[in-house]
Curated annotation (Swiss-Prot):
Belongs to the UPF0391 family. It comes from Rhizorhabdus wittichii (strain DSM 6014 / CCUG 31198 / JCM 15750 / NBRC 105917 / EY 4224 / RW1) (Sphingomonas wittichii). Pfam families: DUF1328 (PF07043). The keyword Transmembrane applies. Coiled coil: none annotated. The keyword Membrane applies. It is found in: Cell membrane. Its main location: membrane. This is UPF0391 membrane protein Swit_2334. Keywords: Cell membrane, Membrane, Transmembrane, Transmembrane helix. GO terms for cellular component: plasma membrane. The chain crosses the membrane at residues 4-24, 33-53. It is a multi-pass membrane protein.
Length: 60
């Protein structure tokens, strides 16, 4: 997902530099959304791994 965020960011910056500000802004906005979704998923999965690891180590 971070790969797509980076691709949309680069495309948005290129479009903005070429004068297509509206479309470029939309791509940059989409890149921001994808970036924050990826960060949120990372945090959720890190917490799940932390709590699952504690339960497994407690039961052994």
């Amino acid at each position: 997902m971070l790969k797509w965020a980076l691709i949309f960011l680069v495309v948005g910056l290129v479009l903005g530099a070429l004068g297509f500000g509206g479309i470029g802004g939309a791509f940059v906005g989409l890149a921001k959304i994808l970036f924050f979704i990826a960060i949120a998923l990372f945090i959720v999965f890190a917490l799940l791994a932390l709590f699952a690891g504690k339960k497994i180590s407690d039961s052994i």
